[in-house]
Structure formats: C-alpha cells, structure tokens
Amino acid sequence: MAVGDTLVAGMSGRLVGLNPDNGIVRWEAPLASPRGTNDVERLVELVAPVSRVGSTVCARAFQVAVGCVDASRGAVEWVQKAGGSHGIHGNDDTVFGTESNGAVVAWRRTDGARLWSTDRLQHRKLTAPLVLGRAVVIGDDAGLIHLLSREDGAPLNRLQTDGSGVAATPVAAADTLVVVTGNGNIYGYRPD
C-alpha cells in the first residue's frame, strides 16, 4: 500500500518502506522476530488484512504479535503478543483481531493497550474482523455472523447463513454486508 511517497509491504515479520521509483528500502519496522529450532518454526509472516488510518499501518504477524507502525517515519509505535492467524481491522481509535482460540481482542490504536477481550466465541474458527458502524463483524465455521459491540465486545446480533462455515473475512460494499460461505453461497445483509 502507498503511504505518501513510500510503498509499504510486509516481509518476514517486518513492515518495509520502499521507494517506488527504484525499489530501495527506506526503512524496516520489525513486528516479530523468528524463533524456534528449525526453519519451519522460525517462519514469520504478516497476514492480511491490515488496518491503516492516516500514516499508521497496523498488522498481525502470524501467531506471534499485532503491532502498529508510523509509515511516514518507519517507526514502530507498539507491538503486543497475539496468537492469531488472521489479519486485523480497525477504526481511528481501535484495532480489532481474532485469536486462534476464538477470543476477540480490541487494542487502543495509539499505544496498544488492551481495551477489552471476550471469549464468547471461544473454540470457533473465526474470520478476521470487519468494523462496520458500531459493530465488529466476525464469521465462524458454523456459518454464523456475529456482530459485537465495538465498545466492549458485547453481542449485538447473530446472523445465520447456510451452516457451511464462513469462507472469508466479511466485507462491506456500499450499504451491504457481504459474506461468502464454504458452499459458495454469497449473502448480502442490509440494515433496516
């Protein structure tokens, strides 16, 4: 993604700022370091989606951490341990993520402080979150769409699909929430 005159990309657990004219690295901002006893255990990658507000880009390092970088300077603003395998989403104030155990977590965008965490969806295979209005929207492996409050993670609503499991992160298209299931069905939900 472009931030000012810099192309920002993920590379082995780091966000990297590149000069788009010649590909020279301007800065590197580590979100995670390799660890483990073999090459597979030491593999560290960033996963999509990422969350950008202004020049701040927040990303998840697979099963290791979530963090934010000021892409105008290449400076790491914060990094917090997090055990998720899907990307994150956020708004001006908060970054949201799902953990591998089914917990949903909200971090303050400015400093990474944990604002809330809920285990109401524990032991479900969750998608990455989508911030939509006052809700955080998350799909699961039973084909349910969960709408949680952005403020405290309290349940707001639950929508049912065909029961085959949500195949990808829900997306917003104009005024419609779009969900794709494992059976290939596409659902569109609009507020009344």
Predicted feature residues:
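Short loop/turn segments that connect beta-strands within beta-propeller blades
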Residues: P20-G23, D70-R73, R108-D111, S149-G153, ...
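Loop/turn-rich, solvent-exposed surfaces of beta-rich toroidal or solenoidal domains
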Residues: T94-R109, A113-L147
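C-terminal closing repeat unit and adjoining cap/tail of repeat-based domains
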Residues: A135, D140-G184, P191-D192
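Extracytoplasmic beta-rich repeat domains
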Residues: M1-D5, E28-V53, E77-D92, R114-L132, ...
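Short coil/turn segments within WD40 beta-propeller repeats
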Residues: G13, V64, G102-A103, A142-L144, ...
